[in-house]
Amino acid sequence: MKKITLLLVFFMFVTSTYSQLFVKDGSYLYNNDNVVFVKQDVNLETNSNIYLRNQAQLVQGKSGVSENKGEGKVSVYQEGTSNAFVYNYWCSPVGIASGTAGNTNFGILLMNRPTSVTASDVITTTYSNGTTSSSSLVVAQHWIWKYLTANGSGLGGPNGWIHVQDAQTLEPGQGFTMKGVSGTDITTVGEATSNNPGNNQRYDFRGRPNDGDIYVPVDVDDYTLTGNPYPSALNVNAFLLDAANTACNGIAYYWEQDKTDSSHYYVDYHGGYGTFSPISLGSNGVYMPATFNTYNWDGSLNTTGSSSGLAIERKYAPIGQGFMVFGDALGTITLKNSHRAYVKEGSGLSQFERNISSQSTVVSSLQVPQIRFDISLNNQYTRQLGLVLIPDATDGVDRGIDAKSPAEDSLPNDVYFFLDNDNSDGSSWEDDE
């Protein structure tokens, strides 16, 4: 068995494949714009590092639970798309670098501010408003929450949300919410843009790379916040349609929020959940943008919305992307190395999220045949529905195709497809009917 030991500085500019990867104390591996594929485990000794830069990714191929070990760290960047008042949903690609083998917990203090191609400063925290500058990055810990199905009564209300703050209690595969920061950081670290040209803060995730089987609990008629837990892209279709993951309904729900929001009060929030239907393993899937609802002081849904979200490619979740899943049964679903892929963000199939000013989208040549309906309701907001035309659609709810609406309570003036006594944002129809 081939085992690669790195004793000195090693720069990588081409795709490389290893059986095992060992980086010695004081050494590092630098990967620029390519993929490192390791068939089995990664062992990073103390003070060793793997730097993934310019969309470089680490993919591992071992089945079963992780055997990664060591106190060295992987460093990988991801950019948020929100200001100090707007949420992004995240899922960390790394955990605490400890001596015990396997995946470990995460907390936001494992996120850094890049200062050069390889160096970074540890972030600090405050209570409510995050800030950034060319000398510091301050994250507001008050807005760090996770949503666990066993603790809640449904999406959209305060029940089930657990306040994490800066504690290292986010288990592998648990997603979390985090608001962005105000200010700009013009520091350049070898990437295409500066650290934060405005509402696009770059974060440096540093820790042990997550790997292998990661278990996510689900329950009947409830949601769980999870996401992509790996330092590589995640094939969301493969995850949702895995034959072992039938405890969820096969749909991913993505939070979108109006980027112009400038208040921390629930009543001033404008946001909602878009739905992604994978359709099939080979399909690019169908994403129905969120309808932006407003919320009451307790976090429950108000009676009107404001506008709609953006068309975003969702087949491959980029590093750090969080999303909700919905349970059809009590049990667990599993994220696996077999669901991972090397797909660069912005390739036409993978986007973290887009600011409304970023309108360019690569149109795929493999679109699912569909009809979209943009329905304006009282000139207040638009509900988009999708009708997918596929040969194997049934009259019932088709798993991974028909998307249950994420709104627990329908608005008084709204429109849906009605399937099996439930509201759906997307439906399917046999193309010969």
Enumerate the predicted regions with their spans:
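Extracellular, surface-exposed repeat architectures
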Residues: 56-108, 208-231
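Bacterial Sec-dependent N-terminal signal peptides
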Residues: 1-25
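Conserved "landmark" site that anchors the functional core of diverse proteins
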Residues: 85, 94-141
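Conserved long hydrophobic alpha-helices within structured protein cores
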Residues: 86, 175-178
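Compositionally biased Ser/Thr/Gly- and acidic/asparagine-rich
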Residues: 164-166, 170-171, 178, 182-433
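A conserved hydrophobic secondary-structure block that centers on an alpha-helix together
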Residues: 139, 143-173, 182-186
